[in-house]
Amino acid sequence: MTINYQFGDVDDHGAMIRAQAGLLEAEHQAIIRDVLTASDFWGGAGSAACQGFITQLGRNFQVIYEQANAHGQKVQAAGNNMAQTDSAVGSSWA
């Protein structure tokens, strides 16, 4: 009986997570544009409230980006470790 693991799929999944993290910047910029368009809500684009909201939004996006990127790296590392272990075990049985 042969078991065929697709370690490349795990690596691809990790890469996809990291790519999605990178795409967050475009979403972040789009939200900032919308906030600036509606800046009257906070008292104008230059107001402390508006700038504070934009700053906090940036911090939140940074945390999400860092966590998603780190998770993608961990998924890729796990896939690589499984592939190496599988290869080592497989060669010891040969």
Curated annotation (Swiss-Prot):
Quaternary structure note: Strongly interacts with EsxK to form a heterodimeric complex under reducing conditions.
Source organism per UniProt: Mycobacterium bovis (strain ATCC BAA-935 / AF2122/97)
Gene: esxL
Keywords noted in UniProt: Secreted
Record protein name field: ESAT-6-like protein EsxL
SUPFAM superfamilies, sorted: EsxAB dimer-like
Similarity section: Belongs to the WXG100 family. ESAT-6 subfamily.
Subcellular compartments: Secreted
Entries under Pfam families matching the protein: WXG100 (PF06013)
Cellular component GO terms held in the UniProt record: extracellular region
